[in-house]
Amino acid sequence: MESTYELFRRGSALLESGDHHAAIVSLQRARELDPEPTSIREALGRALFHARRYEQARAEFEAVVERAPTNDYALFCLGRSLQQLGRHAEARRPLALAACLRPERGDYRLYRDRARAFAA
């Protein structure tokens, strides 16, 4: 039986290689073994997002933000997931927080501004 760490490493490698569906399988198994590490949940959220499974991605990024409320990347990805679900008004807050935490990130500002415009 593979350890949580081995599953996480394999899932992360698959994610980086672009095999999002295979990454999901490994990362979900890792999360089942240990649901606490935000690194596992963030990687799983990324894989789900790239596989266009936005509702599941949203749930993973939300779990990361609950544990690490200043994780700018998780906030950004939560906002992007909400945007992909058409929930633009809800996306405004996490995208605005991400942009405040990392003002040098132009992509954060771009999507924050899009959410503001779309929800207005």
Cite the ranges covered by each PLM segment.
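Terminal, low-structured helical/coil segments at or just beyond the last alpha-helical repeat
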Residues: 1-4, 92-120
